UniProtKB/Swiss-Prot annotation:
It comes from the Eukaryota. The modification Phosphoserine is found at S9. Gene3D superfamilies: 2.30.30.100. The gene is SNRPD2. Keywords: Acetylation, Cytoplasm, Isopeptide bond, mRNA processing, mRNA splicing, Nucleus, Phosphoprotein, Ribonucleoprotein, Spliceosome, Ubl conjugation. This is Small nuclear ribonucleoprotein Sm D2. It comes from Sus scrofa (Pig). Its main location: cytoplasm. GO terms for biological process: mRNA splicing, via spliceosome; spliceosomal snRNP assembly. The modification N-acetylserine is found at S2.
Length: 50
């Protein structure tokens, strides 16, 4: 079973750490993570879609 599909409550600490690393390297937060590492600016546009 993929770590992304497995519930966090059923993961070992090692699996949780690996999943977190994957999310920061490939998920939406990867843009913010990479910009912080390279000291570049990122424009974040937030909107309320009510």
């Amino acid at each position: 079973m993929s770590l992304l599909n497995k519930p966090k409550s059923e993961m070992t600490p090692e699996e949780l750490q690996k999943r977190e690393e994957e999310e920061f390297n490939t998920g939406p937060l990867s843009v913010x993570t990479q910009s912080x590492k390279t000291x570049t600016q990122v424009l974040i546009n937030c909107r309320n879609t009510k």
